[in-house]
Every structure is written in structure tokens, then in C-alpha cells.
Amino acid sequence: LIVYKKGKAEPKNKVMLDTHMDEVGFIITYITEDGYLKFTTVGGIDERVIFGRAVKVGKELIPGVIGGKAIHQTTSEERGKLPSVEDMYIDIGASSKKEALSHVSLGDAVYFDSCYREFGDGFIKAKAIDDRVGCEILLRLINSDLPYSATFCFSVQEEIGTRGAAAAAY
């Protein structure tokens, strides 16, 4: 989304302010015969925070949990390190591939299932908070009287290489 806002004067140089609206997540790549969902990351996700996280899957926002091999099935070497994304899966409670496919499809998006929280002395946390704050700032600027005209861009694909902002800059 690109918005041009006329200000009180035209600047010497064109100005564009950009914020991104996308967020990191996952995409379903495979469904096992037991109904577990294999996935890959979308965007720069710190793999150390994935295991055990609650997620929502697909258009129906099916609840799931990211897991892996049970602790009693791991070797002592495996217990000493974090499992790789390739060794993790999403459990949506399906007991078969057929049951899983009745709710989700290959290529479905997966999102972290977390909520806004206030903590400490005036701190907040939420998924994709940088995106949401950026959008709010641009919306407030658009709705204000500006000294100079400016272009505002609400872009996507920042999480996979700032592609949206790069295209909008032209």
C-alpha cells in the first residue's frame, strides 16, 4: 500500500517512509503418515525459540504445538543440543495424514500463537511488534498536518529480503 500525503510545501527531494506489515512464520512442507506437519521457516526466526511454541495453522487457524523427538527417545548427544528445524514438527492432534489434510494443506502459513503483554515499568511485548508500531506511526503521520509532502509505504516481504520496500522505492 502506497499513500501520498500532500503537505504545506513540496520538499526539495522526495521523501518516502516505509514500514513492513509482514511477520516471521512457517510454511507447511510435508505431512507425515502419523499426521504431523513438517515445516520450514519464513523470515529470520531465531531457531532457539521455536521448540515448544504454540502456533496457529492455515486459514482455519488450527491450534498446534511445535515439537520433536520425545526426550526418552533421544541419545545423550541429542539431549545436549537443540533439535534442528528439520527434526521438528507441528502436532495439531491429528492421528493420520488423512485427518491432518482435512484441516490443513501443503503450503499453508503457520503463525506464532502469542498475545500482547505488558510487563515491568511500561514495557510491552507481542509478536511482530515492530511491524505494528511502524504501521501506527505512519498512520499517525498520514493523519497529521505535514510541513512537507511525503509518500508512505506499507510493504511486505521485509522478512525475506526487504523486497516490498525495494520495489516501492522505484
Describe each PLM feature range.
Residues 1-170:
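N-terminal hydrophobic/helix-forming segments and targeting peptides
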